[in-house]
Design a protein with these regions (language model features):
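Active-site-proximal, structured, solvent-exposed surfaces of multi-pass membrane proteins
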Residues: 12, 35
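Extracellular beta-strand/beta-solenoid scaffold signature
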Residues: 28-30, 51-58, 73-81, 102-119, ...
């Protein structure tokens, strides 16, 4: 297949078909093919260096493979997993692979480059990995029951952690910072579709909690069309600050529960265009530059127990839409913050 052909452009790949631990801290100018299942490949701190093309570690249709302590840089994709289940990636570094800039990625389609991509994978764990300085850090496509824990995905020129059609997964305790992008439309480091964590194309029933998201385009970006929305998410206990655009953007979604997060110094704390049956509860929103929350065409949504310091919460109908059936209770407002519902029923 195409990925395999790209591997062969480099030196002959290292083939791993059984449990393997490399000598410590080696340097290899070749790629790796995992050619078996039920095995552990421990790089023991060794580095695999590419020439700007191909895949560093390739796994296709395997099960129960563990990859640990590997450093992979200089490839088009640091690691690519296509099909299979029960993978573990732990304590690897996929930094310094393909990166580009200066175009909008607002359509939220997968980017076939970057740190690590998993496609069609079930019941797997990524823990304690680093994937910085790529176009995207971690991308998970068409998968389910994934656990993404304690990773660092920062200073990517697109997305830190990206879910596309991925369901019933947990994204916990990750550090996701400075994921930003430039584009001709908006300028240098203007967001341009970049975000810390992205959920799109029906990435439903996921849990997003205890993550640190600072200085990203959006902190968390769920969207961004009716057909691509992600529903029944729980987003909680995240620390979000200094987002270029929105701390959380969640558009066209249903039944998302967003609670106990802190938002500080974002352009908008949260933006919920066309979201319905939203529960936004017990969040603290401070010093947003434009609005603490803007929720266009809000319907059947509940705002309760939030602390709002500075900018207003605005619910409104737009473009002939409806704003109706929303409720507010026990929200605390400081520094002239208001809850504005002009035009809502």
């Amino acid at each position: 297949m195409k990925l395999f052909a790209l591997l062969l452009v480099l030196a002959a790949p290292m083939r791993i078909a059984k449990d393997t631990t490399l000598p410590p801290n080696g340097v290899y100018h070749q790629a790796v093919i995992i050619a078996g299942s039920n095995l552990t490949f421990d790089c023991n701190g060794s580095t695999f260096i590419g020439e700007g093309i191909g895949v560093g570690i390739l796994i296709q249709n395997r099960t129960s493979v563990t990859i640990r302590n590997c450093k992979v840089r200089g490839f088009d994709v640091g690691a690519y997993v296509l099909g299979g289940k029960n993978f573990v990636f732990e304590r690897n570094d996929f930094s310094g692979n393909y990166v580009d800039d200066n175009s909008a990625i607002e359509d939220l389609k997968p980017i076939p480059h970057g740190g690590i991509i998993l496609n069609g994978v079930q019941n797997s764990r990524l823990q304690g990995n680093t994937s910085n300085g790529n176009v995207a850090g971690i991308q998970i496509l068409n998968s389910s029951k994934m656990r993404v824990l304690q990773n660092t995905t920062s200073r990517n020129r697109g997305w830190g952690i990206y879910l596309f059609g991925t369901t019933s997964s947990t994204i916990y305790t990750n550090t996701v910072e400075y994921n930003n992008r430039s584009c001709p439309q908006w300028g240098v480091d203007a967001g341009c579709g970049a975000a810390g964590i992205v959920l799109t194309q029906g990435s439903n029933r996921n849990l997003i909690g205890w993550n640190t998201l600072n200085y990203d385009g959006d902190g968390i970006y769920q969207g961004n069309t009716p057909g691509a929305a992600s529903n029944d998410l729980e987003i909680f206990n995240n620390t979000i600050a200094h987002s270029v655009a929105n701390g959380i953007e969640a558009t066209f979604s249903l039944r998302n529960y967003i609670h106990d997060n802190t938002f500080t110094d974002d352009n908008y704390g949260a933006w919920f265009g066309y979201a319905q049956q939203l529960r936004f509860e017990n969040n603290a929103i401070r010093n947003s530059h434009v609005k603490s929350v803007e929720h266009d065409n809000a319907q059947s949504s509940r705002y309760a127990g939030n602390l709002i310091d500075g900018a207003d919460i605005l619910l409104q109908p737009v473009q002939g839409g409806s704003c109706a059936g929303n409720s507010f209770s026990n929200n605390t407002r400081f520094n002239n913050a208001q809850i504005v519902t002009t035009g809502c029923q």
